[in-house]
């Protein structure tokens, strides 16, 4: 390896001025042009030596060094031709380009020399000097122009002088800028890098024969890939084009790969791509490709070829030593012979004889091979098929027929084979899709590239030949794919069109499947373009798919604008179609919802399964029967926008839909309107309210007592409904929300009995005939009020509203039974306790209508008056009740139980009730006395468990019952002055009077032993009844003692 210095004029350090060759008289520039370049030269290799590695020398030393180098190079040129070749290469390069590397390559001809050269250019693409030059010129022009404007009135000769001065200043600034740019470029070239980081490189194929010419120009881009060939060479692939280079030595290959990887790395860093702003300076080299056709064929050679181009006429050929090479030569020669003769007049023997004469060898053993190859060539010799005006479909034969290609106006050739070479690479523009014709080939990924190639050729006014081996499978598939995308055809339509023009096509099964897939991809792209297409007038008038997609409802702002617009149209007296129907439909829906809210659904506790039961109708409705209210978002909303064609359109953020004037109602809307219409036609049905009352009726055995009770019941009922009842019921609602009351825990032993409910006590057989049936009277409807926000169950301001889950009372939680309960207050049943013997007790139900509601203020005052009475009677009633229980236990040692409870004691699950305590009839039977006894005493069980002080009474029904029973007991006690019998008071008796009767009987007969069950009263009503009965018992005992005395 030796150091070679080559004199180059113009030098690499030339300025980046225009290429018109402006002469510079500056001394520095002349010095810069007189520079040389140094290379490391080896056998077939020349590497540039960067100027930064050379120590700086003075001008005299540089001249001496250059002269000595020239003399030494002239003496060494006789021994090596590398310096001469480098010198000739410099004449081909531009003055701004740098020769990075040059390696010698192998050639098919012994007398041919080929070099692979890497040339680079430092491009000033930042535009810094141009912008600086423009800025300086503008600054000076404005500055001088301003000063000239101020002095223009003084002398007319001044503007001319100023104008000359401005031009002179601009020229000087331009020259200074050029000098600065030249210095920068010189420095960049000397450092072998660009200050802006933009260095572009390319591969040049140079042929050094009788004259030095350019045969190949390949830009080095970001997608450049380098692969080793495995045979002492390497391949470079750029923009789907592959070129093979084989250096003459291992050292040359090593030097070439090192330099090639360096420039490829810079291309990736700067992201150079094809058809980009980079490498525009290569056009000058492409215009200067002047090598011979044989040299061009060698530069564009491809690997793994089965069918190669014919050799050049001047190529020296020897007899092929092997059979494969012989067959290859036979193929090429056979084509030439068949093209030169008339196939209608000659035979196959004549063709074989001509072939033996040309090859000068006996081809007897290749007879079958020659016949088969002749048939193949005959199939390929058909003229190319014209599929479209700019697309021809042919075979290998058509691609090798130069005259035919030129006659058809073909300048672009699409080669869809791997085994066939490009026959005329310098004459036509080739695009290679190197695939085999088998079922594993993925041809689909190339169809977009082939479509762009054919489209570009059509735009340039050229025609394209698409060929493969026979023009049957691979090339036919490419043309079909192009037809589907270019003309938006379906797969079958494109296939039939191509087969109609060229009947011999037959793509393999794999290619057909890929074509069907490609058709689906094109359909998807069509829909995408249709969605992204601008909303033209035709789209606005389209009524297809004019439905709002989920999530495409109008925004709140559009809804507000729509409402404002509808209000404005309503005030103007213009009602759009369908709005009046919507208004009436909304009105009917609101009426139906109000009527549904009046239906109160209440849970209930039922009576046990006894012989007598209260049977009623269930007036509640389940939620399944209620029509759900449609949300506002489900209603169709449109932002009406009038169009120029008289139609209305809905304008949203993502779409514009046509609004039909008469849109048919949906099935859901029709069903909803029908249900609302039926709800309006339903008659007013009785609704259970909180004012329904429980009335207990009793009957006595004595005829005189029962006879006198017929008129008293009606009279007392009328009186209770007029004055006494209204005054006492008004005090029910006087409950303070913050007041804490005590309530005993109620347990009920009940069993479900359908929709019936109430308290049923088993009477004696003598009383069953006189027992009356329950009468159900519906109460008239009244306007309900909404509950107060801070109201608790039991206050007066929400007595008529629906129960809420979040209310402070326990109404909702306690109503979990499935049957209806008659909630209300117990009527005043027995006003006096004059009867000594009560034989039977029965309970019936009858609602009372026409009761006044009262106000909270009035009832509070009346409630305070009765509070003192309750507190005073509480302790006395408890003591009297305990005494009565002890006396009953002494009197009745044995109990008669029902058949169901006689066998074994049963543990009944206590069920909570929100109105009163219900007990099984087997526990309330008359079993405290002997069968022969005339006294029927019923004793309730008493339990000592109490709830917390802050436990409230749930519902206004309990409050009504408690207060009214308390008042009824007070009235009954006052009317019954001092007797133990209830003379003239009627046959009705409450549970409280029964307890008082028991207590009275026990006190009157202390010696008679009685046994009773102690039970907790069902509610504070029964508790207060205990107080009343105890007080009446004490009064009767005192009167008896006074009479006896």
UniProtKB/Swiss-Prot annotation:
SMART domains in the record: DSPc (SM00195)
Highest taxon in the source lineage: Eukaryota
Record EC number: 3.1.3.16, 3.1.3.48
Record-level GO cellular component terms: apical part of cell; cytoplasm; cytoskeleton
Compositional bias segments (type: Polar residues): 1-20, 149-174, 560-569, 602-625, 764-774, 1008-1021
A Pfam family this chain is assigned to: DEK_C
Keywords noted in UniProt: Actin-binding, Cytoplasm, Cytoskeleton, Hydrolase, Phosphoprotein, Protein phosphatase
One Gene Ontology MF term: actin binding
Record family assignment: Belongs to the protein-tyrosine phosphatase family.
Name by which UniProt lists this protein: Protein phosphatase Slingshot
Species this chain originates from: Drosophila melanogaster
């Amino acid at each position: 390896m030796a150091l070679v210095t080559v004199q180059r004029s113009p030098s690499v350090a030339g300025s980046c001025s225009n290429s018109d060759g402006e002469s510079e008289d500056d001394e520095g520039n002349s010095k810069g042009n007189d520079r040389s370049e140094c290379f490391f030269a080896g056998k077939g290799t020349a590497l540039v030596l960067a100027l930064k590695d050379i120590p700086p020398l003075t001008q005299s030393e540089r001249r001496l060094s250059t002269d000595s180098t020239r003399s030494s190079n002239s003496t060494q040129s006789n021994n090596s031709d590398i310096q001469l070749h480098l010198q000739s290469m410099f004449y081909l390069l531009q003055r701004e380009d740098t020769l990075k590397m040059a390696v010698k390559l192998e050639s098919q001809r012994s007398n041919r020399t080929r070099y692979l050269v890497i040339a680079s250019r430092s491009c000033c693409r930042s535009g810094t000097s141009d912008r600086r030059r423009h800025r300086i010129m503008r600054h000076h022009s404005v500055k001088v122009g301003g000063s000239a404007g101020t002095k223009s009135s003084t002398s007319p000769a001044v503007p001319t002088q100023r104008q000359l001065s401005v031009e002179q200043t601009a020229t000087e600034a331009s020259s200074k800028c050029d000098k600065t740019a030249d210095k920068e470029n010189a420095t960049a070239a000397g450092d072998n890098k660009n200050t802006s980081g933009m260095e572009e490189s390319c591969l040049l194929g140079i042929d050094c024969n009788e004259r030095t010419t350019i045969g190949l120009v390949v830009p080095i881009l970001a997608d450049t890939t380098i692969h080793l060939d495995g045979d002492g060479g390497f391949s470079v692939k750029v923009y789907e084009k592959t070129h093979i280079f084989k250096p003459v030595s291992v050292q040359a290959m090593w030097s070439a790969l090192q330099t090639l990887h360096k420039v490829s790395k810079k291309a990736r860093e700067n992201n150079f791509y094809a058809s980009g702003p980079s490498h525009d300076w290569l056009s000058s080299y492409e215009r200067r490709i002047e090598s011979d056709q044989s040299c061009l064929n060698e530069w564009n050679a491809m690997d793994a070829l089965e069918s190669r181009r014919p050799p050049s006429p001047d190529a020296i050929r020897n007899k092929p030593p092997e059979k494969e090479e012989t067959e290859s030569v036979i193929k090429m020669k056979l084509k030439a012979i068949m093209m030169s003769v008339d196939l209608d007049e000659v035979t196959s023997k004549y063709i074989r004889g001509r072939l033996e004469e040309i090859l000068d060898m006996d081809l007897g053993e290749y007879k079958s091979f020659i016949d088969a190859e002749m048939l193949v060539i005959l199939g390929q010799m058909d003229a190319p098929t014209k599929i479209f005006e700019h697309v021809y479909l042919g075979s290998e034969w058509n691609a090798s027929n130069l005259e035919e290609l030129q006659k058809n106006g073909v300048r672009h050739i699409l080669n869809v084979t791997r085994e066939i070479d490009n026959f005329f690479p310098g004459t036509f523009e080739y695009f290679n899709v190197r695939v085999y014709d088998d079922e594993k080939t993925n041809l689909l990924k190339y169809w977009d590239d082939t479509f762009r190639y054919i489209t570009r050729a059509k735009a340039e006014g050229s025609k394209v030949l698409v060929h493969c081996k026979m023009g049957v499978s691979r090339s036919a598939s490419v043309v079909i794919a192009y037809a589907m995308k270019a003309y938006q055809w379906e797969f079958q339509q494109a296939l039939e069109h191509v087969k109609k023009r060229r009947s011999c096509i037959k793509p393999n099964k794999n290619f057909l499947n890929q074509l069907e897939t490609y058709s689906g991809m094109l359909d998807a792209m069509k829909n995408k373009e249709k969605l992204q297409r601008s909303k033209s007038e035709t789209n606005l008038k389209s009524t297809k798919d004019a439905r709002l997609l989920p999530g495409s409802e109008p925004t709140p702002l559009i809804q507000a604008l729509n409402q404002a617009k509808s209000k404005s149209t309503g005030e103007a007296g213009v009602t759009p179609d369908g709005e009046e129907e919507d208004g009436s439909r909304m009105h009917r829906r609101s009426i139906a919802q109000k009527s549904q809210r009046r239906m109160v659904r209440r849970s209930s506790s039922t009576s046990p399964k006894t012989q007598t039961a209260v049977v009623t109708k269930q007036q509640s409705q389940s939620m399944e029967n209620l029509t759900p209210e449609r949300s506002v978002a489900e209603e169709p909303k449109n932002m009406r926008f009038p169009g120029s064609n008289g139609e209305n359109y809905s304008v949203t953020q993502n779409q514009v839909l046509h609004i039909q004037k008469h849109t048919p109602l949906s099935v859901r809307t029709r069903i909803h309107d029908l249900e609302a219409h039926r709800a309006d036609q339903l008659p007013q049905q009785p609704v259970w309210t909180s004012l329904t009352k429980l009335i207990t009726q009793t009957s006595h055995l004595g005829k005189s007592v029962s006879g006198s009770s017929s008129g008293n019941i009606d009279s007392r009922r009328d009186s209770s409904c007029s004055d006494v009842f209204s005054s006492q019921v008004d005090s029910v609602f006087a409950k303070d929300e913050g007041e804490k009351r005590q309530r005993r825990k109620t347990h009920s032993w009940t069993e479900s009995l359908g929709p019936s409910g109430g308290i049923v006590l088993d009477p004696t057989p003598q009383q069953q005939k006189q027992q009356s049936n329950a009468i159900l009277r519906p109460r008239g409807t009244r306007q309900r009020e909404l509950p107060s926000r801070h109201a608790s169950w039991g206050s007066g301001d929400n007595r008529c509203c629906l129960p809420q889950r979040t209310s402070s009372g326990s109404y909702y939680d306690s109503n979990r039974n499935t049957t209806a309960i008659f909630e209300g207050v117990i009527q005043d049943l027995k006003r006096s306790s004059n009867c000594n013997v009560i034989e039977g007790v029965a309970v019936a139900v009858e609602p009372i209508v026409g009761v006044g509601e009262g106000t909270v203020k009035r009832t509070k005052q009346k409630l305070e008056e009765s509070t003192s009475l309750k507190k005073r009677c509480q302790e006395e009633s408890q003591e009297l009740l305990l005494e009565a229980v002890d006396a009953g236990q002494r009197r009745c040692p044995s109990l008669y139980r029902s058949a169901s409870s006689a066998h074994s004691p049963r543990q009944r699950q206590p069920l909570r009730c929100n109105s009163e305590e219900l007990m099984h009839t087997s526990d309330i039977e008359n079993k405290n006395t002997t069968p022969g006894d005339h006294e029927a005493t019923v004793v309730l069980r008493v339990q000592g468990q109490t709830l917390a002080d802050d436990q409230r009474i749930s519902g206004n029904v309990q409050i009504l019952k408690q207060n009214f029973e308390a008042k009824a007991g007070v009235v009954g006690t006052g009317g019954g002055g001092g007797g133990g019998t209830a003379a003239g008071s009627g046959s009705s008796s409450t549970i409280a009077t029964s307890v008082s009767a028991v207590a009275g009987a026990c006190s009157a007969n202390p010696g008679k032993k009685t046994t009773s069950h102690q039970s907790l009263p069902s509610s504070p009503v029964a508790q207060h009844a205990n107080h009343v009965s105890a007080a009446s018992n004490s009064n009767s005992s005192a009167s008896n003692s006074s009479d006896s005395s």
